[in-house]
Amino acid sequence: MSERLRGSAVNAPAFIRFVKKCNEIGVAIHSFRFLRDSELVAAADFAPYTGKEKMHVYSLSKAFTSAAVGIAVDEGILSLDEKVSEIFPDKMPDVISENLSKATLRDILTMQSGHPRCVLDKIIENGDSLKTFFASEFTYEPGTTFIYSTAGTMVC
């Protein structure tokens, strides 16, 4: 492990215990970065990784998105109960269905948009992610049916 733990930003013994526990239970850590006020204050890379490799993060984007939305909610910029049709009026279809009109940011974040399936393939095909997401049929009343959807992350 190459590491840089400095100052009081990271409790080094606790971090080392965390890494050891991860190893014990079979969780492979490739790299670790801790930033405070946009400054890198701690870093660790675990062989064979150097921290310079490009990595696919897949569903990790959902965690980043949820954290960013949480910060915006905390700062009063957004409300989880805000209707997406009010947030993105210029991205709505010409005719807004009853279900789409009910969809909130919370519904999209919790994968309860009302879509019968993930519409990511349509978004990739059509290009405009927001217009495509909202133009897709909202079969279910938002907030009532969970359908795993990567597309919702793009909207939020």
Segments (PLM) and residue ranges:
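Short, basic/aromatic recognition patches
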Residues: 4-22
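Second-shell loop/turn segments in exported
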Residues: 4-6, 93-96, 141-143
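A short, well-structured edge-of-sheet supersecondary motif
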Residues: 16-50
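Active-site SXXK
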Residues: 38, 56-81, 108, 156
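Glycine/charged-rich beta-loop-alpha catalytic/anionic-binding loops adjacent to active sites
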Residues: 44-53, 134-140
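A structural signal for the main folded, soluble domain(s) of proteins
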Residues: 50, 60-63, 68-69, 89-94, ...
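Active-site helix/loop module of the DD-peptidase/beta-lactamase fold
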Residues: 56, 75-115
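Catalytic-site signature segments of enzymes, centered on catalytic residues
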Residues: 118-156
